[in-house]
Design a protein with these regions (language model features):
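Generic protein-terminus/edge-of-domain signal
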Residues: 1-41
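Short acidic-glycine-tyrosine-enriched beta hairpin
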Residues: 38-50
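Append "Primarily bacterial transcriptional regulators
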Residues: 46, 191-198, 203, 207, ...
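A hydrophobic/aromatic-rich effector-binding and dimerization subdomain
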Residues: 62-127
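An amphipathic alpha-helical interaction segment
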Residues: 110-170
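A short, Lys/Arg-enriched amphipathic alpha-helix from helix-turn-helix/homeodomain DNA-binding modules
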Residues: 158-196, 217-236
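Terminal helix-turn-helix DNA-binding modules in bacterial transcription factors
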Residues: 209-248, 270-273
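…primarily DNA-binding HTH/wHTH and HhH modules…
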Residues: 254-273
Length: 273
């Protein structure tokens, strides 16, 4: 269904929604706070918020502020057996991990509304054998545009993104700078995302956009480079180096090293010498 929340007649000020549907809303005003999972949802006027089945959203409306937003809600059953049903998992803005809203330009808002209008037009027609497919395709068109806007958001925030990448590099250096204090575990994408105040999903998309590598691949590459330095610059055993880097089991370190470098750490030491 296509909805216009400005036409609502009842405005509870504090409630929790357990979504059994997919939902996208273009917010025309910030009417209060949204808690999405365990985090606050970053949204302002002119942004798109998105939710998926099974997700829980806590809403606190500001007194005297009417919700002003247009959007669409659709049940998973609507897209089963369609191309959208197969692709829905690739729209990363539906993830719980993505708590950053999509910020739209004026032209993008018009495109968003046009897609809603197309869905509404189809919903207003008598149902026939083409209805489900056409509705699903128009929803898919809307989601594809949102993915384009989402990627555009990375481009227009390029300077900010590069600052995040530099901060990521610094954090990696700090994490591994001390050989005297072995790390208790390998660093995770979430660890670094939290450090730069981004969700893991958004941080991962940003790093992928800037480097061509996933955040996990980038971390792994850093670990391998540091491992190479320590293998050649010291007489420490492979096990000692593995523990310093945060590997619980040396054989895990050896397996990853060989996969990336093409030889074991011991073989690498012999070859380089």
């Amino acid at each position: 269904t296509v909805v216009d929340l400005s036409k609502a007649t009842v405005f509870p000020t504090h409630f929790t929604l357990n979504y059994g549907l997919y939902a996208l809303f273009l917010k025309q005003t910030k009417c209060g706070d949204l808690r999405y999972g365990r985090q606050m949802y970053d949204y302002q006027e002119g942004t798109v918020t998105s939710f998926a089945p099974g997700q829980v959203v806590e809403v606190k409306l500001n007194d005297g502020v009417r919700p002003m937003s247009h959007g669409i809600l659709f049940h998973p059953d609507l897209i089963r057996g369609t191309s959208l049903g197969q692709e829905i998992k690739h729209y990363s803005f539906f993830s719980y991990a993505s708590n950053e809203a999509l910020h739209l330009s004026d032209d993008e808002k018009k495109i968003f509304q046009d897609c809603l209008d197309k869905v509404q037009q189809e919903l207003s027609r008598p149902i026939d054998k083409h209805s489900k497919r056409l509705i699903a395709r128009n929803i898919e068109l809307l989601l594809d545009y949102c993915m384009r806007f989402y990627e555009r958001q990375f481009v227009t925030r390029s300077k900010v993104n590069k600052d995040v990448l530099m901060k990521f590099e610094d954090l990696l250096d700090v994490y591994f700078q001390s050989e005297q204090s072995p790390n208790e575990k390998l660093p995770t994408v979430k660890y670094f995302a939290d450090k730069v105040n981004l969700s893991s999903n958004y941080f991962g998309d940003l790093i992928k956009k800037e480097t061509g590598k996933t955040a996990q691949e980038y971390i792994q590459g850093k670990i391998i480079n540091i491992a190479k330095e320590r293998i050649l610059a010291s007489e420490k055993t492979v096990s000692e180096i593995a523990y310093e880097l945060g590997f619980q089991y040396p054989q895990h370190f050896t397996r990853i090293f060989k996969k990336v470098v093409g030889c074991t750490p011991t073989e690498y030491r012999v070859i380089q010498v």
